[in-house]
């Protein structure tokens, strides 16, 4: 598919997810949407602190029961190189990009190898870092995946909005004020087209720093944790037209 086709897939997903008011129904929608990219497993979860258990952080999942039991009983999250990189990265990445030394870190190698036993030999994870320090992720796994430079931005957007929707279903809170200024709507609109803060500044004849400030303010008003999340929410609330 072209970048436009992937973008349309993401927008259709965002526009349709709002009708689901129960977590199982929303997860069915996520499963169907990500399934079109070849993914067979999904987990939406917080990342535990040292004094927390992984199982208590999970918001929703479509994992094989055997893998979830194995993962939690062996505390694999303590050794998982994907979780480790997720804490350090703000950008989504393929599981294979998470570094580890198989000889020095046999537990990390065990996690990655055993995942393959459950048709999770490849994957893609979207880190989520909240303004208050909350760490979470949407992790997708499978075997034959449609992962390329055109599909990844769409998956990023879909995962961010999917996380937000699941979280709000579990913890209903009023949406923050979405009264953006015309300039804030402009910068979010350009951001939705993949423009960087520098490029937005050039287009609008403002400095890069000013563009970044407008993006940050818009994200805060929308209750977003980052720029991609802000774009997803702005589209969902019809503040901008993609």
UniProtKB/Swiss-Prot annotation:
The keyword Transcription applies. Transcriptional activator that functions in response to the quorum-sensing autoinducer IV-HSL (isovaleryl-homoserine lactone). Activates BjaI expression. Is sensitive to IV-HSL at concentrations as low as 10 pM. Keywords: Activator, DNA-binding, Quorum sensing, Transcription, Transcription regulation. InterPro entries: Sig_transdc_resp-reg_C-effctor (IPR016032), TF_LuxR_autoind-bd_dom (IPR005143), TF_LuxR_autoind-bd_dom_sf (IPR036693), Tscrpt_reg_LuxR_C (IPR000792), WH-like_DNA-bd_sf (IPR036388). The keyword Metal-binding does not apply. Coiled coil: none annotated. It comes from Bradyrhizobium diazoefficiens (strain JCM 10833 / BCRC 13528 / IAM 13628 / NBRC 14792 / USDA 110). Residues 173-238 form the HTH luxR-type domain. GO terms for molecular function: DNA binding. Residues 197-216 bind DNA. PROSITE patterns: HTH_LUXR_2 (PS50043). Belongs to the autoinducer-regulated transcriptional regulatory protein family. SMART domains: HTH_LUXR. Gene3D superfamilies: Transcription factor LuxR-like, autoinducer-binding domain, Winged helix-like DNA-binding domain superfamily/Winged helix DNA-binding domain. The lineage of its organism: Bacteria, Pseudomonadati, Pseudomonadota, Alphaproteobacteria, Hyphomicrobiales. This is Transcriptional activator protein BjaR1. The gene is bjaR1. Disruption phenotype: In cells lacking this gene, bjaI expression is about 15% of the level in wild-type cells and IV-HSL is <25% of wild-type levels. One of its GO terms (biological process) is quorum sensing.
């Amino acid at each position: 598919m072209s970048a436009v086709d992937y973008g349309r897939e993401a927008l259709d997903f965002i526009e349709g997810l709002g009708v689901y008011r129960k977590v199982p129904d929303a997860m069915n929608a996520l499963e169907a949407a990500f399934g079109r990219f070849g993914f067979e497993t999904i987990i939406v979860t917080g990342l535990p602190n040292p004094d927390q258990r992984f199982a208590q952080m999970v918001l929703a999942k479509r994992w094989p029961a055997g893998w979830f039991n194995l993962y939690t009983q062996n505390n694999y999250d303590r050794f998982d190189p994907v979780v480790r990189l997720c804490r350090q990265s703000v950008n989504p990445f393929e599981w294979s990009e998470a570094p580890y030394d198989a000889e020095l870190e046999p537990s990390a190698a065990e996690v990655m190898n055993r995942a393959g036993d459950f048709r999770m030999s490849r994957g893609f994870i979207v880190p989520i870092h909240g303004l208050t320090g909350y760490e979470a992720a949407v992790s997708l796994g499978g075997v034959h995946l449609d992962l390329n430079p055109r599909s990844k931005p769409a998956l990023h957007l879909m995962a961010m909005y999917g996380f937000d929707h699941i979280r709000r279903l579990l913890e209903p809170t009023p949406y923050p004020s979405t009264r953006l200024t015309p300039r804030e709507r402009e910068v979010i609109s350009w951001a939705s087209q993949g423009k960087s803060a520098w490029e937005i500044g050039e287009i609008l004849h403002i400095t890069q720093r000013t563009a970044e400030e407008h993006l940050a303010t818009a994200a805060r008003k929308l209750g977003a944790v980052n720029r991609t999340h802000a774009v997803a929410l702005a589209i969902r609330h019809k503040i901008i037209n993609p």
